[in-house]
């Protein structure tokens, strides 16, 4: 079992019950999934770019991503229908907690000029989104073998009903919020 999963069961859940006054342990917010999404617009011109993006995402997430394809053609962007334009991976269970642990303790401190993550990236329904500008903050990616710096979006989906509950949950997981 993952370290953060144990921490959630033993410390975080009881503290959230005390803070918000839940009557049932099933009301306590928890993280259900983490989705990593990488848009690769350069894949339109060069197919090898997509292979590199998929290999980077596999190293970061620990499982093979799904290649996302264009739903409809957009002439202005030179995109045809069913053309590969990105990749995504959904993490749940132990892999999710392992990724979260690596992200908070190892990857975030490696961001240049890091002063904390924004406290305004909640969606109003208890979910949180983080944009990462370059994939080299993850220790699994070797700097010398990177062909191009690519960003990715990390969506953390929780069972929290409000942004306040979600922020309390993520703060308990030691997310370094600004202010």
From Swiss-Prot:
Q: Name one Pfam family in it.
A: Ribosomal_L5
Record flagged with keyword DNA-binding: no
Write out the entry's keywords from A to Z: Ribonucleoprotein, Ribosomal protein, RNA-binding, rRNA-binding, tRNA-binding
One GO BP: translation
UniProt feature coiled coil, ranges? none
Identify the GO cellular component terms for this protein. Answer: ribonucleoprotein complex; ribosome
- What Gene Ontology terms describe what this protein does at the molecular function level? rRNA binding; structural constituent of ribosome; tRNA binding
- Which SUPFAM superfamilies does this UniProt record tie to the protein? RL5-like (SSF55282)
Give the highest taxon in the source lineage: Bacteria
Instruction: Quote the PANTHER family the UniProt record gives.
Output: 60S RIBOSOMAL PROTEIN L11-RELATED
Q: How does it assemble?
A: Part of the 50S ribosomal subunit; part of the 5S rRNA/L5/L18/L25 subcomplex. Contacts the 5S rRNA and the P site tRNA. Forms a bridge to the 30S subunit in the 70S ribosome.
NCBIfam families recorded for this chain?
PRK00010.1 (NF000585)
Function as written in the Swiss-Prot or TrEMBL entry = This is one of the proteins that bind and probably mediate the attachment of the 5S RNA into the large ribosomal subunit, where it forms part of the central protuberance. In the 70S ribosome it contacts protein S13 of the 30S subunit (bridge B1b), connecting the 2 subunits; this bridge is implicated in subunit movement. Contacts the P site tRNA; the 5S rRNA and some of its associated proteins might help stabilize positioning of ribosome-bound tRNAs.
Similarity section: Belongs to the universal ribosomal protein uL5 family.
Q: What's the protein called, per UniProt?
A: Large ribosomal subunit protein uL5
Gene behind this chain? rplE
């Amino acid at each position: 079992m993952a370290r953060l999963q144990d921490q959630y069961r033993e410390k975080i859940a009881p503290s959230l019950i005390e803070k918000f006054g839940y009557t049932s342990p099933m009301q306590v917010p928890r993280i259900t999934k983490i989705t990593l999404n990488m848009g690769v617009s350069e894949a339109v011109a060069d197919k090898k770019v997509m292979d590199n993006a998929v290999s980077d995402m596999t190293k970061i997430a620990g499982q093979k991503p799904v290649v996302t394809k264009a739903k409809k053609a957009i002439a202005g962007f030179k995109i045809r229908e069913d053309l590969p334009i990105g990749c995504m991976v959904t993490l749940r269970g132990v892999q999710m907690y392992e990724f979260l642990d690596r992200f908070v303790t190892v990857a975030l401190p490696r961001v240049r000029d890091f002063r904390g993550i924004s406290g305004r990236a909640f969606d109003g329904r208890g979910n949180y989104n983080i944009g990462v500008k370059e994939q080299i903050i993850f220790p699994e990616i070797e700097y010398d073998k990177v062909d191009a710096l690519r960003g990715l979006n990390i969506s953390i989906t929780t069972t929290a009903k409000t942004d306040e509950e979600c922020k309390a949950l993520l703060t308990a997981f030691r997310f370094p919020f600004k202010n």
